[in-house]
Amino acid sequence: MAYLRTGAEFIASYRSSLNRMSDLQQKIKMFGFNNAYYNQVGLLKHDWLPHSPVWLEALRRLPRELQEARDFRIARASLLYASKHVLPKEQWTTIEDDIPYLEPYVNVVVKEMSDRSNWDNFVNPEIYSE
């Protein structure tokens, strides 16, 4: 299977969805984002979300460079948390850089699980055609 990549069109559509928000929605989103702790230690949103079987499978399918970048962000955040420090403000994750990088992989895994479930519950119609 060819690796999915977080393509330029996906990033552009995510950023344009931020721009289409009303002024009040943008202010609320920025308030929540700026008061969150994860961006102050350099994490992305998908780095700290709770793991489920779908997320674990999506993480397993990540390309090596994305896995290594994620591992680095988590290790750095753990060290910062343990020492009760945050990154300098210039190094904080911005809302434009907080791309949902796992979303394409999660969508593929959900579709595959749905297809597998449909095939597992398939009943041959010839049995009932008497």
From Swiss-Prot:
Keywords: Electron transport, Membrane, Mitochondrion, Mitochondrion inner membrane, Respiratory chain, Transport. It is a peripheral membrane protein. It holds the Pfam family UCR_14kD. It is found in: Mitochondrion inner membrane. GO terms for cellular component: mitochondrial inner membrane; respiratory chain complex III. It comes from the Eukaryota. GO terms for biological process: mitochondrial electron transport, ubiquinol to cytochrome c. Belongs to the UQCRB/QCR7 family. Component of the ubiquinol-cytochrome c oxidoreductase (cytochrome b-c1 complex, complex III, CIII), a multisubunit enzyme composed of 3 respiratory subunits cytochrome b, cytochrome c1 and Rieske protein, 2 core protein subunits, and additional low-molecular weight protein subunits. The complex exists as an obligatory dimer and forms supercomplexes (SCs) in the inner mitochondrial membrane with cytochrome c oxidase (complex IV, CIV). PANTHER family: CYTOCHROME B-C1 COMPLEX SUBUNIT 7, UBIQUINOL-CYTOCHROME C REDUCTASE COMPLEX 14 KD PROTEIN. Component of the ubiquinol-cytochrome c oxidoreductase, a multisubunit transmembrane complex that is part of the mitochondrial electron transport chain which drives oxidative phosphorylation. This is Cytochrome b-c1 complex subunit 7. It comes from Schistosoma mansoni (Blood fluke).
